[in-house]
A protein has these predicted regions:
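N-terminal "arm"/small-domain region of PLP-dependent enzymes with the aminotransferase-like
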Residues: 1-36
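Conserved N-terminal alpha-helix of the aminotransferase class I/II PLP-enzyme fold
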Residues: 25-72, 95-101
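Conserved C-terminal alpha-helix-loop-beta "cap" of PLP-dependent enzymes
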Residues: 295-367
Length: 398
């Protein structure tokens, strides 16, 4: 007998749960894309996106996913033959580096594994060793969705300044924007990329690139930039179609308007605090379960765990078995252990992730944790007692 019939909970790290307000905003007929309400709506999105990113500088959007935002950002500031430095803490660090390689850049990767954050001293040393300042940009993940590590972007800026290096600091906030605290201007970030389907609570299909004055200067020095990826007309449009390089992503814009209204009604500080409390509740439950069984948080140091996603190790085949049980027996879908082992490797089945980003509250998290505990019992997976009480205690204290 399955108990999954009812409203499901997609507890994966994106696409995240879409609020009813977003769905209602998108449920409409096609608008006029040349004049009228959509033009005014889009004009209003830009300052509100800046508020979420904590920047006074340029905000642009592209029809595409986070990978599109990666390429758009790179295409405006680096050319074939340019050097970039990639500190990697999981699958997506390597992914952005691979994209730079595909554009003809010379990529140097510093691999910190999948369980620890950046070692800022090693990055500073690498930049000091670049006496000729060949490195044009440092491509850094704020949060790597695969490993759930949270990196110190403000500390990275300080390390770059200490090295006296002029490289651009480019931050990937695809998993973290609207979930983990991020301060683009205060932290000295030159370029930030994000996407619609995680903390911004909109379906996949919008990529965002924010850039400051140093990045604008780098763009001005470029000999050639793809006409489509060029952020100059998007940031300073003379005509409405230039915002999106052609036909507007109409219904995504309606959804984004509703999502930004929700974000600003709650307040970004309150959103960060909500994500922090819910994440700590999940960690508390997992730590208790781990005291009596194989479950282990992928990131040992809580200071370097994302508040948007939690990666877990449990040993094969328990990860896959638990995911299947919670989905088909309880209606809770957990995330696969993306990038933790190669597909086909038996160890791949020993990892999973919990997404807790965007439109998520206390009862949703407690429900997911309850489903997981039921799965441990049903599958006879050893686990410590008292996990739900530990999570509830965190929520009660706030």
């Amino acid at each position: 007998m399955s108990l999954a019939h009812g409203r499901p909970y997609m507890a994966i790290p994106g696409p995240s749960v879409m609020p009813e307000d977003v769905l209602r905003a998108m449920h409409r007929s096609a608008p006029n894309i040349y004049e009228g309400d959509l033009v005014a709506l889009t004009d209003g999105l830009i300052p509100d996106l800046r508020r979420v990113a904590r920047t006074e500088h340029a905000a642009t959007f592209y029809i595409g996913n986070g990978h599109a935002a990666w390429e758009a950002a790179l295409s405006n500031v680096v050319a074939a033959g340019d050097h970039v430095l990639v500190p990697a803490t999981g699958r997506f660090g390597h992914g952005w580096g691979d994209m730079a390689t595909g554009l003809g850049c010379k990529v140097e990767v510093i691999d910190f594994g999948k369980r620890t954050p950046f070692d800022l001293n090693r990055i500073e040393e690498a930049l000091r060793a670049d006496k000729e300042h060949r490195i044009k940009a440092v491509l850094a993940r704020h949060v790597d969705t695969s490993s759930s590590v949270l990196n110190d972007i403000a500390g990275l800026r300080a390390a770059m300044d200490a090295a006296g290096h002029p490289a651009l600091l480019m931050a990937d906030c695809i998993a973290s924007l609207g979930c983990d605290r991020f301060e683009m201007d205060a932290w000295g970030v030159d370029v930030m990329v994000a996407a619609s389907q995680k903390g911004l609570m909109v379906p996949p299909g919008l990529g965002f690139v924010f850039f400051g004055p140093r990045a604008a200067e780098a763009r001005a020095r470029m000999e050639r930039v793809s006409r489509y990826w060029d952020w100059v007309p998007r940031a300073n449009p003379e005509y409405f179609f230039q915002y999106s390089g052609g036909t507007a992503p109409t219904h995504h814009l309606y959804g984004l308007r509703a999502a930004l209204d929700m974000i600003h009604a709650e307040g970004i500080e309150a959103i960060w605090n909500r994500h922090d409390t819910l994440a700590r509740a999940i960690w508390a439950a997992c730590e208790v379960w781990g005291q009596g069984g194989p479950l282990e948080l992928n990131i040992a140091d809580a200071a370097h765990r994302s508040r948007a996603v939690t990666a877990l190790r449990i040993g094969a085949p328990h990860g896959t078995d638990l995911r299947k049980w919670t989905e088909f027996q309880a209606g809770v879908t957990l995330g696969i252990g993306l990038g933790m082992a190669e597909p086909g490797d038996p160890e791949w089945h020993g990892f999973f992730r919990i997404g807790h980003m965007g439109h998520v509250n206390a009862h949703m998290v407690m429900g997911a944790l309850g489903a997981m505990q039921a799965g441990f019992i049903a599958l006879d997976i050893p686990h410590g007692a008292g996990a739900l009480e530990a999570a509830a205690g965190v929520m009660a204290r706030g």
